[in-house]
């Protein structure tokens, strides 16, 4: 059975880990880095993922970044005349992570635990699960990122403690409060903001640079796509540098031009200025911190440890704000970029039975309910309820002789249905005609361990039942998922062939170089006939490379290899013959008794 890998599918970066021999290993990508940019690009029909995609983002408009922000929506991105859903783009990233995990483990990988922000709603969780399926992974569990981080932090901790996980990623923000003790990880409360992260901190720097440049030169760089991508890269770099130094130089030569010639952007950005620009973002993260404490019925003094997750928590102003709010230094013992994937791999170990005595009790981040008369949102399951859970409530009809009930399922905290996230609708039909208020309709909500919702409605009079697994308007049908799985497999096969072809071309080029070298060495040592045969084979391979016919390249490469081998054999045979004749001559010389007298002089050491 395949190992279960742990995947942190992030907005800006992703990470994959696995439990091996009781120890979690973060798997490096082919470039040797332990995290991979969540970037996908399309270029001449080829798909690029990770570092290579990010590197060419400036010049390639068909580059997709931060797709996680659109999970669970009906957003589509059009590339080269084809529309892609966020699930498909995420699946391309997952496929890449899966492929290098397989290279590392030396075996196929088909099972995974994938993390999501704690504040993801049902549609976003379902979309993540679908992305995993499209990538050829059986998603064993969807686990909340802060919970995964707590699992990684607390696995070897003996004492009972209450921890707050502050997770500021590239595009999402979560806070979870957990109680740890005796192998039980119990989430007490969770809060967050799905549209707040490192990208927003980059954006304030970009806006500042655009404004400064506009004031100085009267040119709006935000209208220039290529300039904007350069600004984005520079802003991200400056943000990272300002975590270690108090000022940084931003230098972007030839960023634009006017009638007088090229224009360059040269600017010094201080940490103080960056903190001023991003102060409102840092303050926005404090709202969910206070909310989580309130929901858990705790005060800052009750928190034993604060765990920081996500690269953006390296920003000094963020750490200062946490210290001010909670009155304690954040714990620095975990790697904020890797801790979530490590936790996911541990959860994989729990599912596979490799990790014993660990119980994970997570919660639902948002309240669940249905729309009732007057457009009111009636909650059935309150937020921060431990999952898995099930809850039933009896409702009745709103009109006389009503034979159908339309059930509208929602998720959120607002009192009116229209202000909450609609998860889907379904109908219970065949209710016997009766005066309003008489029929008894029982609605049951189930939330599984992945935080995914299943709903049943039952007419208690007839025992007629209708059930659905919630499919939001942005969700994919089974046929769509199957089609995408098939396309993903075909693309993986095409990628494999493309890689094989590139390797074959490299081998052919290498062989041509070696042939030229060998031909120089054998000049005058083997027959002209043999040399011509090798030269012809070399020219034939060059011609095949020009035509780019893979089968022909393979054939001509084998033929040239054979010809070069024959040359080498002839060369060795000749060398062996020469050595033999030289050996026999040397032997004959030794038979002559020519003794040469050597003159010598005695040296007196006592001189």
Swiss-Prot record:
Provide ranges: composition bias, Low complexity: 575-589
Region: Disordered, residue numbers: 575-607
Q: Which residues carry this modification: Phosphothreonine?
A: 172
Bias (Acidic residues) occurs at 596-607
> What is its induction?
By stress conditions e.g. heat shock.
Q: Superkingdom of the source?
A: Bacteria
Q: Which GO terms describe its molecular function?
A: ATP binding; ATP-dependent protein folding chaperone; unfolded protein binding
Looking at the Swiss-Prot or TrEMBL record, what is one Pfam family this protein matches? HSP70
Q: Which UniProt keywords apply?
A: ATP-binding, Chaperone, Nucleotide-binding, Phosphoprotein, Stress response
What does the UniProt function comment say about this protein?
Acts as a chaperone.
Protein family: Belongs to the heat shock protein 70 family.
Q: Which NCBIfam families match?
A: PRK00290.1, prok_dnaK
Protein's name according to its UniProt entry: Chaperone protein DnaK
Specify the species.
Answer: Geobacillus kaustophilus (strain HTA426)
Q: Which gene encodes it?
A: dnaK
């Amino acid at each position: 059975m395949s190992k279960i890998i742990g995947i942190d599918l992030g907005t800006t970066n992703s990470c994959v880990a696995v439990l091996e021999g009781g120890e979690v290993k973060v798997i490096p990508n082919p470039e040797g880095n332990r995290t991979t940019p969540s970037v996908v690009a399309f270029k001449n029909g080829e798909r690029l993922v990770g570092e290579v995609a990010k590197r060419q983002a400036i010049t390639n408009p068909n580059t997709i970044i931060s797709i996680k922000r659109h999970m669970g929506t009906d957003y589509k991105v059009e590339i080269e005349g084809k529309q892609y859903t966020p699930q498909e783009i995420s699946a391309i990233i997952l496929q890449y992570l899966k492929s290098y995990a397989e290279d590392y483990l030396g075996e196929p990988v088909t099972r995974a635990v994938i993390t999501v922000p704690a504040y993801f709603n049902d549609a976003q969780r379902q979309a993540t699960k679908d992305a995993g399926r499209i990538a050829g992974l059986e998603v064993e569990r969807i686990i909340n990122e802060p919970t995964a981080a707590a699992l990684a932090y607390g696995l070897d901790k003996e004492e009972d403690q209450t921890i707050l996980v502050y997770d500021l990623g590239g595009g999402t923000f979560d806070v979870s409060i957990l109680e740890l003790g005796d192998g039980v990880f119990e989430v007490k409360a969770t809060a967050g903001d799905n549209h707040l992260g490192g990208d927003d901190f980059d954006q304030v720097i970009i806006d500042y640079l655009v404004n400064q440049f506009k004031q100085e030169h009267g040119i709006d760089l935000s209208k220039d796509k290529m300039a904007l991508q350069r600004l984005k890269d520079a802003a991200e770099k400056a943000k990272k540098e300002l975590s270690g130094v108090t000022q940084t130089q931003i230098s972007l030569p030839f960023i634009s031009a006017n009638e007088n010639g090229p224009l360059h952007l040269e600017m010094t950005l201080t940490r103080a200025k960056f903190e001023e620009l991003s102060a409102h973002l840092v303050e926005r993260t404090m709202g969910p911190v206070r909310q989580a404490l309130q929901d858990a019925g705790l005060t800052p003094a009750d928190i034993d440890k604060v765990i920081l997750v996500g690269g953006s928590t390296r920003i000094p102003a963020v750490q200062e704000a946490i210290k001010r709010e909670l009155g304690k230094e954040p714990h620095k013992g975990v790697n904020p970029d890797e801790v979530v994937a490590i936790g996911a791999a541990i959860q994989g170990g729990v599912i596979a039975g490799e990790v014993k005595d660990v119980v994970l009790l997570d919660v639902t981040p948002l309240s669940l309910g249905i729309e009732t008369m007057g457009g009111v949102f009636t909650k059935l399951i309150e937020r921060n309820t431990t999952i898995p859970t099930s809850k039933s409530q009896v409702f009745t009809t709103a009109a006389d002789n009503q034979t159908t009930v339309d059930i509208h399922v929602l998720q959120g905290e607002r009192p009116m249905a229209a202000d909450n996230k609609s998860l889907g609708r379904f109908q219970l039909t065949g209710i016997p005609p009766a005066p309003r208020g008489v029929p008894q309709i029982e609605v049951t909500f189930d939330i599984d361990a992945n935080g995914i919702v299943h709903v049943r409605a039952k007419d208690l009079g007839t025992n007629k039942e209708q059930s659905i697994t919630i499919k939001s308007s942005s969700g994919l049908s089974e046929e769509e998922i199957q089609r995408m799985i098939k396309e993903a497999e075909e693309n993986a096969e095409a990628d494999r062939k493309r890689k094989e072809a590139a390797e074959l071309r490299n081998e052919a080029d290498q062989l041509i170089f070696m042939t030229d070298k060998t031909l120089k060495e054998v000049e005058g040592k083997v027959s002209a006939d043999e040399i011509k045969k090798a030269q012809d084979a070399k020219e034939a391979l060059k011609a095949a490379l020009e035509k780019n016919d893979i089968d022909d390249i393979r054939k001509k490469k084998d033929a040239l290899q054979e010809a070069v081998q024959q040359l080498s054999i002839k060369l060795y045979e000749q060398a062996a013959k020469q050595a033999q004749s030289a050996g026999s001559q040397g032997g004959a010389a030794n038979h002559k008794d020519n003794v040469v007298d050597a003159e010598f002089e005695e040296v007196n050491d006592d001189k």
